[in-house]
Each structure stands twice: as C-alpha cells, then as structure tokens.
Amino acid sequence: MATAPGPAGIAMGSVGSLLERQDFSPEELRAALAGSRGSRQPDGLLRKGLGQREFLSYLHLPKKDSKSTKNTKRAPRNEPADYATLYYREHSRAGDFSKTSLPERGRFDKCRIRPSVFKPTAGNGKGFLSMQSLASHKGQKLWRSNGSLHTLACHPPLSPGPRASQARAQLLHALSLDEGGPEPEPSLSDSSSGGSFGRSPGTGPSPFSSSLGHLNHLGGSLDRASQGPKEAGPPAVLSCLPEPPPPYEFSCSSAEEMGAVLPETCEELKRGLGDEDGSNPFTQVLEERQRLWLAELKRLYVERLHEVTQKAERSERNLQLQLFMAQQEQRRLRKELRAQQGLAPEPRAPGTLPEADPSARPEEEARWEVCQKTAEISLLKQQLREAQAELAQKLAEIFSLKTQLRGSRAQAQAQDAELVRLREAVRSLQEQAPREEAPGSCETDDCKSRGLLGEAGGSEARDSAEQLRAELLQERLRGQEQALRFEQERRTWQEEKERVLRYQREIQGGYMDMYRRNQALEQELRALREPPTPWSPRLESSKI
C-alpha cells in the first residue's frame, strides 16, 4: 500500500480518525471546523474522520520535520493547524479522560475500555490485510521514525500539558472502539487503497481489534525518536502519555495455574460427553457430523446406483441397436441371395420410377398359400409319426397275444392227450372186470374179497375220470375264449392297419396335389417375371 505524506498546507492527521462519533451539535462542529482546511468532502458534508493517507502522514511527520528543520529555525506556531488540536480546544469536555471524570449519559457510553482484542471478528478481513501490507511495506521507515502504540501507552509522562491530554484521549478512544455498535465505524483507507479498517455494509464487526497487534510492530522505539531536541512533534508528545489502565486481565496468570485448571476442564468435558440427555455441545456436534456423514454416504450410494443404472441402460440400448443392425444385415443378405438365385426382380435404372406391378398381389397370395401348405404338411407329418408309433405298439401287443395263444394251445393239446390216455385206461379196466367174474362161479371168501377190491378200484377210477373230464371241459372253454379274443384283436388290428394305410394314401395324394399346384404357381410367377415381348405387326407375304 503506497502512501505519501500530504503537502504542508493540508491539515495534519491524527489518531482522531479512530475515534467514534460523539454527541455534539452540528453548530458546534461547524464553528470548530470553520478555519480548518480539508475537513469537508466535495459534496459539502463533514468528514467523520481522517483517511489512512493522513494517518500515515501523521506517523511520518517527525522524520519529515527533522529534515525540514535543518535549514530553518524552529518557531512556535501560534495557531494550531491540525484537526485534533482545534477540535479539543473548542470542546474540552470531549478530551477530558482523567480518572475523576465520569461518563455522562448518552455521551461516553461507547468510550469505555473493553477487552476487544479477544472478541471474535466476522468481517471480510480487508482491514487486517491493509494493516499487514502497511506493516510489510512501511516497516523500515516506521521503525526508524515512529514508535509502537505499546511504547506510547506504557511510558510515563514527561511534560504533561494540553497536547498530552489530547493525545491521551485520542489513544483511549482508539483502544475503546466498540465492535458491536449499530453505526458504521470510520474508514482508514482512501479511495486508492484496497482495504479499510471500516466496516462495510452487510459485514460483521470491524477487525480492528485483531489488527492492533500489528501497530505494535510498525516502528522502532519511540524513545530513540524522542531523544533528539529537533523531534518536537505530536509523536513526541504522545510518548509522554501516562500508563493507561489495562483493557483486560488474564484469567490464569501463570503456567502452573493453567496446568491446575486443565484436569478439571478435561473432567468436565468427559462428564459432558457421558451425558445421555444429549445436551452437551460436543455430543451434539458429533451427532450432527455423523448425520452429515450418513447423508453424504447415502448421496454417494444413490449417485453410484444411478450411474450403474445409466450404464446398464446404455448397454441395453447398444445391444438393441446391434441386434437391429444384424437383422438389417440379414435381410440385406437374403435379398442379395434371392437376387443371385434369379428370384428377385430385375434392377431398374436409378432415374426411373418404380412401375406398378399387377402381379405383386397374386405373388404375395401364392407365397402365403405355400407357407400355409408347408405348415399343413409339417402337421400331417407329425400326425403320421404319431400313428406309426401307435401302430408299432399295437403290433407288439398282437405279437405278445400270439405267443400266449401258442402256449395255451400247446397246454390244451397236452391235456387232451392225457385225457385220451385216461379214457383208454378206464375202458380197459371196464372190459377186464366182467371177464374175471364169468369163470369164477363158486363164490369163495377170496373171490369175494377180490371182487370188493375190484369194485373199490373201479369207483376210484370213475371219480378220477370225471375229474379229468371236468378239467378238460374247462380247458376247452378257456381255449375257445382265447381264440375268440385273438380273433377280435386280429380284426381290430386289421381295421387299424387299413385306416392307417388309407390315411397315408390320402396324405400322399394331398402332398402330390400341393406339389403340382406349387409347380404351376412357380411357372406362373416365372412367366410374370419374364419381360413382355415387344409387339410386332404380322407380316404377310405378297407372294402367292
């Protein structure tokens, strides 16, 4: 921040730019400022304080005055030219800051010394940056010429007087700036500077309290500057101020007290964190951060899910596009194949319009009929396969029945042979019985006994013969029943066979008819595709 001292004619600045507005009437201000130059703005309004350039010119004044007093003699000035001297000469009550003075109601409510250094500042930081630039650019010059405000405030008074009391009042006003007031504070920057100590509209409190530390490092010791007899300016007078009361006091004066307080503070924090009611601010902060982290995690998850969904949709669209292109390529290849086989129409010239084809509709109908007949043929083939499977099953059943009939016939023949043998045995026994009874006329006990035995044997033979006859009758009935069943199965198989053969003949006949019809349709299509022969008049020979 480049600053230069103003010309000699312009009124010197002072620390009064840091003062807040006092409750004085406009008439008193106009009367006090009538003789001072540069105290009004171009629009005619009174300036509230001095600019930063005038403040810096005030700080540089001792060095410039020391250079200018080499060739000229020092002469006391009867009429004060600076703003602060004129102001406090006319209004001595504003500069009375002695220990016995009490603040009047409504006048010095905002002038009390407050520990403003430790108040939080919420400004835009322009004043802090401007003071940093001031310290960096003009540090060397201010170190040689001026002193720090800390040195000004701590030195005992050397020659108390009206100017010392005025400077003391100005310094106390600078240290007691009210940061929470509703009125805007005076600016410390001119139109060319980039930052200001003033509070811009819409911003927080002024950062002047946090920037006062830089003023303590803006120059060297004011004692060195005030030792020479030719350094007789306002900074020399400021160095003679008495020590002001401290604006604040530390709660812990030593490191031992701080170490003793720390365990109690840690225990309080632990007890506060262990509370279950959630009233602890640390617990609330942790819960708020956890809630924010969960919300951020959910947001990231939703974004990831949305991204994956979009990627899947894009992949699906790409696959659909590839499928559509493949279908188009397949249709094109089919058309090319049909054109190569001679089934496609002849290509026309690119400039000619397509002519109306009267055979297009019959061709489409023929194609539709061919497709329909092909479907019918496939259905008939399926039915034929099913009928052939049923016929094979029936043939297998007939073969098994024939095998069973053959076995039953063999068994019946064996039983018939046994029955014939038994009959012959019975007949022989019957013939032998009367032949034995005729020669034995005398009846003895032996004969009687033998006769009884023969009768008993004949009765047993008769019973067995009757039993055999009954069994033979049953076998004959069973054989007849099996023969009837076999004959019925044979007739059924014959009917099925004739029906299947008739169905096959019908299918073959229908297939042949369809084949002939397809051939005829293909011939018609071929005839329709052939270009018509050009018409030529019939030439008749004139020779007879």
From Swiss-Prot:
GO biological process: innate immune response; nervous system development
Signal peptide from the UniProt entry: none
Glycosyltransferase recorded as keyword: no
Top-level taxon: Eukaryota
List of residues that carry Phosphoserine: 176
Annotated localization: Cytoplasmic vesicle; Cell projection, Axon; Cell projection, Dendrite
Statement: the UniProt record of this protein carries the keyword Nucleotide-binding: no
Cited Pfam families: Fez1
Positions of region (Disordered): 61-84, 116-252, 335-365, 430-465
Keywords on record: Cell projection, Coiled coil, Cytoplasmic vesicle, Developmental protein, Immunity, Innate immunity, Neurogenesis, Phosphoprotein
Coiled coil, from the record: 294-530
Biased composition (Low complexity): 186-222
InterPro entries assigned to the protein according to its UniProt record, in alphabetical order: N4BP3
Role, per record: Plays a positive role in the antiviral innate immune signaling pathway. Mechanistically, interacts with MAVS and functions as a positive regulator to promote 'Lys-63'-linked polyubiquitination of MAVS and thus strengthens the interaction between MAVS and TRAF2. Also plays a role in axon and dendrite arborization during cranial nerve development. May also be important for neural crest migration and early development of other anterior structures including eye, brain and cranial cartilage.
Family: Belongs to the N4BP3 family.
PANTHER family associated with the record: NEDD4-BINDING PROTEIN 3
Subunit (UniProt): Binds NEDD4. Interacts with 14-3-3 proteins. Interacts with MAVS.
Name of protein: NEDD4-binding protein 3
Species: Homo sapiens (Human)
